């Protein structure tokens, strides 16, 4: 079956473009030039780029530079793109040369052809609405692409933040549920001193809360845009009316508190804002992976590992070992973290590679940053739903571990000194006897004294909790 085509020309030459396509010659060239990932532009990025084109059409019309009929047609075409109706027309690869020019022209061509069609012109004629003269009026790739990237980051961060709020709540529930479960804390994988399992999970709550707040602060990096600066920040070919109104008009469309950069040269040259956002996303991923390492260790076994907690069984763990269940959810979260660390390195190197008045590597920055945010959001969701909510504690086993450990000898130090306590601990390890047994055998303390010194709850209480507990004891 032969596809009908139309001829389109650009400064490079003439090409045949599918007759029914809304994209044009420049998008088609880009598709042929950049068969890199097979991944197209992120749909949220496409939507935001269309928002910018819509704001530009409104602003240029208000400035008297774009006739009403053309502006209305462009706005209608933009609304269709925003609604996702022309998604298949965006054919360029996510990673492309040219600082995003291919993505910008793909959008310009689609909107021009659809707007022209609304006004009664055939696709490819560009007589009524031209991709450069009308759709791209007062704009440059060098400011619409980074602005679309910032809006997309803001849109993608919102569901990640919601996922983190949910994770924080689920961890808080476990912190409360396990508050009375005493186990042995470990430093450098060696027995240390007793700790409540609830305190362990409360530490995770604080960590996730801190990560969430960092991400909230990262929004500020994305609110400053360089629209109006055109190619290098000098605002060439931009009217005063457009220069001062484009950002407020875009702000109305998006609902974000956007502001035009005070230094448009800086905002056009540098990508440090994206590096900063990537950094906080990476930090969150690293923190969650560390927590997942803990969960895997604490649930290891069930007979020959730590065995302090049970993770919900989600699937068979082996094709050869019957009944084996693996900690698959913590494992996948850690893998996402590794992936994000790699993305962050790419983003860092791409930002560093900019030269003079522009960084040409925004496409790879966006491709990696968008994926980092979306994969982390999904990882956080599955961690909450498929792991944290179903964790249970092996209470008796935790207590046995604590009581059999020589680590509780630390509590003796204020009463019998470090040296004597160390001797008790070494003897306990060597003989297999408990610290409690040895202290009583050697007559170092009475059973009543020892009961108070080795009280696991007193050993794990902090600050005001300890004062309240001591007050209750005296009252009794």
Language-model features: locations:
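Conserved, well-structured ligand/cofactor-binding cores
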Residues: 1-476
């Amino acid at each position: 079956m032969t596809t009908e085509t139309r001829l389109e020309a650009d400064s490079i030459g003439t090409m045949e473009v599918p007759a029914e396509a809304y994209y044009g010659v420049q998008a088609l060239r880009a598709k042929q030039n950049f068969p890199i990932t097979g991944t197209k532009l992120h749909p949220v990025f496409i939507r935001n780029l269309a928002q910018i084109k819509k704001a530009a059409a409104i602003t240029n019309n208000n400035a008297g530079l774009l006739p009403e009929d053309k502006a209305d047609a462009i706005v209608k075409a933009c609304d269709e793109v925003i609604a996702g109706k022309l998604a298949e027309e965006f054919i360029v690869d996510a990673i492309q040369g040219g600082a995003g020019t291919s993505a910008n022209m793909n959008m310009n061509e689609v909107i021009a052809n659809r707007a022209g069609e609304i006004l009664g012109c055939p696709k490819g004629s560009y007589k009524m609405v031209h991709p450069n003269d009308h759709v791209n009026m007062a704009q440059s790739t060098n400011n619409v692409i980074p602005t679309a990237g910032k809006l997309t980051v803001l849109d993608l961060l919102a569901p990640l933040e919601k996922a983190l709020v949910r994770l924080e709540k689920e961890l808080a529930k476990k912190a409360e549920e396990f508050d009375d479960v005493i186990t042995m804390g470990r430093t450098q994988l060696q027995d240390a001193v007793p700790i409540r399992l609830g305190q362990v999970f409360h530490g995770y709550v604080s960590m996730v809360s801190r990560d969430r707040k960092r991400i909230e602060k990262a929004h500020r990096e994305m609110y400053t845009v360089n629209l109006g600066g055109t190619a290098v920040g000098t605002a060439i070919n931009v009217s005063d009316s457009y220069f001062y109104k484009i950002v407020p008009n875009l702000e109305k469309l998006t609902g974000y508190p956007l502001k035009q950069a005070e230094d448009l040269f800086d905002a056009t040259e540098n990508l440090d804002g994206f590096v900063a956002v990537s950094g906080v996303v990476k930090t969150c991923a690293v923190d969650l992976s560390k927590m997942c390492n803990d969960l895997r260790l604490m649930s290891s076994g069930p007979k020959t590992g730590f065995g302090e907690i049970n993770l919900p069984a989600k699937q068979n763990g082996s094709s050869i070992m019957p009944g084996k269940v693996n900690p698959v959810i913590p494992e996948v979260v850690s893998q996402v973290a590794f992936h994000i660390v790699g993305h962050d390195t790419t983003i860092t190197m791409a930002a560093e590679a900019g030269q003079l008045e522009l960084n040409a590597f925004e496409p790879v920055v966006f491709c990696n940053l968008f994926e980092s945010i979306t994969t982390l959001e999904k990882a956080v969701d599955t961690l909450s739903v498929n792991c944290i909510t179903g964790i249970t504690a092996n209470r008796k086993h935790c207590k046995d571990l604590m009581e059999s450990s020589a680590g509780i000898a630390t509590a003796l130090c204020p009463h019998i000194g470090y040296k004597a306590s160390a001797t008790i601990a070494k003897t306990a390890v060597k003989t297999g006897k408990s610290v409690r047994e040895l202290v009583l055998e050697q007559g170092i303390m009475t059973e009543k004294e020892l009961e108070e010194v080795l009280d696991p709850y007193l050993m794990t209480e902090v600050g005001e909790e300890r004062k309240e507990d001591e007050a209750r004891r005296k009252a009794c």
